[in-house]
Curated annotation (Swiss-Prot):
Native source organism of the sequence: Ectromelia virus (strain Moscow)
Annotated S-S bridges: C23-C26
Record keyword Disulfide bond present: yes
PANTHER family in the cross-refs: GLUTAREDOXIN-1
Broad class of where this protein is predominantly found: virion
Protein name: Glutaredoxin-1
Protein backbone atom coordinates (compact mmCIF):
# COMPACT_ATOMS: atom_id res chain seq x y z
CA UNK A 1 0.00 0.00 0.00
CA UNK A 2 2.80 2.48 0.82
CA UNK A 3 4.47 1.80 -2.53
CA UNK A 4 1.23 2.47 -4.41
CA UNK A 5 0.55 5.64 -2.38
CA UNK A 6 4.00 7.07 -3.15
CA UNK A 7 4.29 5.92 -6.76
CA UNK A 8 0.86 7.34 -7.68
CA UNK A 9 2.00 10.75 -6.50
CA UNK A 10 5.36 10.55 -8.24
CA UNK A 11 3.70 9.55 -11.52
CA UNK A 12 1.65 12.73 -11.69
CA UNK A 13 4.11 15.43 -10.74
CA UNK A 14 7.59 16.59 -11.57
CA UNK A 15 8.32 17.92 -8.05
CA UNK A 16 6.80 16.13 -5.08
CA UNK A 17 7.52 16.79 -1.43
CA UNK A 18 6.25 14.53 1.33
CA UNK A 19 5.86 16.50 4.55
CA UNK A 20 4.48 16.58 8.03
CA UNK A 21 3.30 20.14 8.66
CA UNK A 22 4.39 20.04 12.31
CA UNK A 23 8.00 19.38 11.23
CA UNK A 24 10.22 22.50 11.15
CA UNK A 25 12.50 20.97 8.49
CA UNK A 26 9.45 20.41 6.28
CA UNK A 27 8.36 24.03 6.69
CA UNK A 28 11.88 25.21 5.85
CA UNK A 29 11.95 23.05 2.71
CA UNK A 30 8.57 24.41 1.66
CA UNK A 31 9.86 27.96 2.17
CA UNK A 32 12.72 27.23 -0.23
CA UNK A 33 10.50 25.66 -2.89
CA UNK A 34 7.82 28.32 -2.53
CA UNK A 35 10.30 30.96 -3.75
CA UNK A 36 9.71 29.55 -7.22
CA UNK A 37 6.73 29.89 -9.52
CA UNK A 38 5.74 26.40 -10.64
CA UNK A 39 3.59 25.47 -13.61
CA UNK A 40 0.16 24.20 -12.68
CA UNK A 41 0.34 20.51 -11.80
CA UNK A 42 4.14 20.46 -11.65
CA UNK A 43 4.43 20.65 -7.84
CA UNK A 44 2.65 18.64 -5.18
CA UNK A 45 2.85 18.77 -1.41
CA UNK A 46 1.77 15.51 0.22
CA UNK A 47 1.02 15.47 3.94
CA UNK A 48 2.05 12.02 5.15
CA UNK A 49 -0.86 12.10 7.61
CA UNK A 50 -2.94 11.04 4.58
CA UNK A 51 -1.42 7.56 4.88
CA UNK A 52 -1.95 5.11 7.73
CA UNK A 53 0.06 3.50 9.20
CA UNK A 54 2.73 6.16 8.93
CA UNK A 55 5.55 3.78 9.89
CA UNK A 56 4.81 1.68 6.77
CA UNK A 57 5.21 4.79 4.63
CA UNK A 58 8.45 5.72 6.38
CA UNK A 59 9.77 2.17 5.87
CA UNK A 60 9.04 2.49 2.16
CA UNK A 61 10.85 5.84 2.03
CA UNK A 62 13.86 4.18 3.61
CA UNK A 63 13.71 1.38 1.05
CA UNK A 64 13.69 3.73 -1.96
CA UNK A 65 15.69 6.71 -0.64
CA UNK A 66 17.79 5.48 2.26
CA UNK A 67 16.01 7.80 4.71
CA UNK A 68 12.83 7.59 6.78
CA UNK A 69 12.56 11.23 7.77
CA UNK A 70 10.52 13.96 6.17
CA UNK A 71 10.65 15.96 4.11
CA UNK A 72 11.29 13.51 1.29
CA UNK A 73 11.73 15.46 -1.92
CA UNK A 74 11.51 14.06 -5.44
CA UNK A 75 12.26 15.62 -8.81
CA UNK A 76 10.36 13.30 -11.08
CA UNK A 77 10.85 9.82 -9.63
CA UNK A 78 14.35 10.69 -8.41
CA UNK A 79 14.80 11.41 -4.72
CA UNK A 80 17.00 14.40 -4.02
CA UNK A 81 16.86 13.63 -0.29
CA UNK A 82 15.56 15.82 2.47
CA UNK A 83 15.80 19.38 3.72
CA UNK A 84 19.59 19.51 4.13
CA UNK A 85 20.05 18.23 0.56
CA UNK A 86 17.62 20.82 -0.81
CA UNK A 87 19.31 23.57 1.21
CA UNK A 88 22.71 22.57 -0.14
CA UNK A 89 21.45 22.75 -3.74
CA UNK A 90 19.81 26.11 -3.02
CA UNK A 91 22.96 27.50 -1.36
CA UNK A 92 24.94 26.59 -4.48
CA UNK A 93 22.43 28.69 -6.48
CA UNK A 94 21.70 25.59 -8.56
CA UNK A 95 18.08 24.94 -7.59
CA UNK A 96 16.51 27.36 -10.07
CA UNK A 97 18.61 25.93 -12.90
CA UNK A 98 17.66 22.36 -11.98
CA UNK A 99 13.96 23.20 -11.75
CA UNK A 100 14.14 25.01 -15.11
CA UNK A 101 15.92 22.08 -16.73
CA UNK A 102 13.16 19.66 -15.74
CA UNK A 103 10.53 22.06 -17.08
CA UNK A 104 8.51 22.73 -13.94
CA UNK A 105 8.84 26.52 -13.68
CA UNK A 106 6.62 29.12 -15.27
CA UNK A 107 8.44 31.11 -17.89
CA UNK A 108 6.40 34.31 -17.65
Amino acid sequence: MAEEFVQQRLANNKVTIFVKYTCPFCRNALDILNKFSFKRGAYEIVDIKEFKPENELRDYFEQITGGKTVPRIFFGKTSIGGYSDLLEIDNMDALGDILSSIGVLRTC
